[in-house]
C-alpha cells in the first residue's frame, strides 16, 4: 500500500522553509513554492517549473499539493452554491458560495461537527468529530470554481473557529501575508460563540473582523440556547471587547437570530442597547432556518424591521441579513448531515 503524501497546501512560509531545508533545496525555493501554491494555485508539483527537475522529484517523494475537489454541490435559484467536501476520514464538511451584487462571499467550516451544541444549530446536533487542518480549511477556498471571484471570506460554517484556533490562525496568515494570497484582513470575518482564551488570542494575533454569536442579551436565556454561556458569559465577552479599539479598520459585529416568542420583543432590543453601550459595533439580525426536531420558529419581516429600527434609533447600527440558499438545505450542517445519514442508510427527517 502506497504511503499517503503530505499536503503542501495550508503550509505557512516557515513550514515550507523547513521542508526545503530538510530536502537540501536552496533557501529561495520556499518562496517559489508558496508562489506556485497561493498565487498561481497549481494542482501538481510538476507545474512548479522554476524548481529543478531534481528538486521537484525530491519534493514529490513525500509531498503533494493536496487540493481536492468537492464531492457534491447544490445550486440555489438565487445563485448560492453549497459545496460538500469529504475528509480523509470520510466525514463531510460544507462551504457555501454566496454571490451578492458586487461581492462574492465564501462561508467556510473549521471543524467536523461542533462541541458547542447550540440549540438552533444543525452542526451542533452532529456532535464533535474532528478539527480541520489548515490544509482542509484552505482547500475549501482553493478548490471551488469561483475562487477567483471571491471578495470576502467568513468563518461561519461548521464548527467553532476559536476551538481550532491554531489551524484557523495559520489559514489567516496564509490569506493575509504577502507570500500567500495577499488579502486585506478586512476581507475576512471570523465568527465565534466567544471562548475566552481564543477570543483574546484572536484579537491580539489577527486583524480580521470579529462576529460574536449573541442571539439573546439575557445570560440565563443564552445558557439555554448556547451552553457555552455557562463557561464564559456574554457580559464577560463584552468586558474583554471594551479593551479593544473597533473604531478603525477592524469591525465588530454581533449575530442575532430572531426566534418567534423567544427573543423577538423590543424588551430584548432595549437590553441589547444597554449591553453594547460604549462599543463601536453593529448587530446583524438573522432569520432562523428551521431544523429537524427543534421547537424554534423564525419571525415575520415586520418583526425584524421593528427590532432593527429600535436598535438603530437608539444608537446601535443594525442590519437584516438577507436569507440565501433556502432551497438547498440553507441551515448550516444540513447538507453534511443528510449526506452522512444517507451513507448510513438513514433519512433526515
Predicted feature residues:
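Generic beta-strand structural signal
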Residues: 81, 93, 104-108, 116, ...
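Short linear Ser/Thr-Pro motifs
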Residues: 76, 109-110, 191, 213
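Conserved AdoMet/S-adenosylmethionine-binding subsite of the radical SAM
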Residues: 145-152, 157-321
